[in-house]
Amino acid sequence: MSQAVQTNGTQPLSKTWELSLYELQRTPQEAITDGLEIVVSPRSLHSELMCPICLDMLKNTMTTKECLHRFCADCIITALRSGNKECPTCRKKLVSKRSLRPDPNFDALISKIYPSRDEYEAHQERVLARINKHNNQQALSHSIEEGLKIQAMNRLQRGKKQQIENGSGAEDNGDSSHCSNASTHSNQEAGPSNKRTKTSDDSGLELDNNNAAVAIDPVMDGASEIELVFRPHPTLMEKDDSAQTRYIKTSGNATVDHLSKYLAVRLALEELRSKGESNQMNLDTASEKQYTIYIATASGQFTVLNGSFSLELVSEKYWKVNKPMELYYAPTKEHK
């Protein structure tokens, strides 16, 4: 095929197009006139309806005037504003937004293929909001846990430093080695008279004269942690007892006996401190007092816990509530 073009000059210019074998053999497709429907899976069209930038379905489609590639309006405008002013697909130069034109026909085609797209996008937004909320809560709880650990370490270091400066402190007790190291969360009352005074024994158990919270031992990190609210028994404890509510966080593998031994040592040490004594022999003698651990049942009764029960077993058997487990203590009857 050739074409001659006459110009103002003396010689005509001619162009010749060489057709390939495919172009020579091809025939136009016949139009469908009998109502035949061809079923095409929407999944097979996904690559054609996908924005190359956000990899999601095209929304408010914009087409480049130069290379005819399609993008979401927000995606391509953001790319031109922050990128190299070129097509993200073929790298052809795009000067500005004037190199783009809206493509409402393509949007209409997408809405025809996916008539429930608004519902899909609303569902997608709800899922993303739920994921973001969950991640934010996880980040917050992780930050709080890390902060509490750092505070516990700082308290422990201050206690040891104070012990070194004073030249005195309680020694490690063999029975209390099963108890958790201290991480104090005290309910401190207002007023200068309630300032906390802290001491620390060699095992790292931090003590103060206010409400105490105990953290899990590092060697027990693999076990699940359980939070406890430890209160004196409302009827078996005498009114003049100086017992206080204690907040404890320890391993689920710890047993009721561990709590009883910890309580005996802790109360004995506080009693000696109130009397101005710090002799280890006096501490061993005073800590021989035994305590019984109780839990309140749904009927309002107090059940004595077996000393061999782990705290995890107690929680599964008696508590079954997603909040700190409430336990009660009182001196064992034969020691009263």
Curated annotation (Swiss-Prot):
Compartments annotated for it: namely: Nucleus; Cytoplasm; Chromosome
EC category: transferase
**Tissue and organ distribution:** Expressed in embryonic stem cells.
Which terms does the UniProt entry file under GO BP?
A: anterior/posterior axis specification; chromatin organization; epigenetic regulation of gene expression; gastrulation with mouth forming second; gene expression; germ cell development; mitotic cell cycle; negative regulation of transcription by RNA polymerase II
**Which Gene Ontology molecular function entries are recorded, alphabetically?**
chromatin binding; histone H2AK119 ubiquitin ligase activity; RING-like zinc finger domain binding; ubiquitin protein ligase activity; zinc ion binding
Quaternary data: Component of chromatin-associated Polycomb (PcG) complexes. Component of a number of PRC1-like complexes; these complexes contain either the polycomb group ring finger protein PCGF1, or PCGF2, or PCGF3, or BMI1, or PCGF5, or PCGF6. Distinct PRC1-like complexes are composed of a RING1 subunit (RING1B or RING1A), one of the six PCGF proteins (PCGF1, PCGF2, PCGF3, BMI1, PCGF5 or PCGF6), one PHC protein (PHC1, PHC2 or PHC3) and one of the CBX proteins (CBX2, CBX4, CBX6, CBX7 or CBX8).
Protein name (database record): E3 ubiquitin-protein ligase RING2
Point out the gene that encodes the protein.
Answer: Rnf2
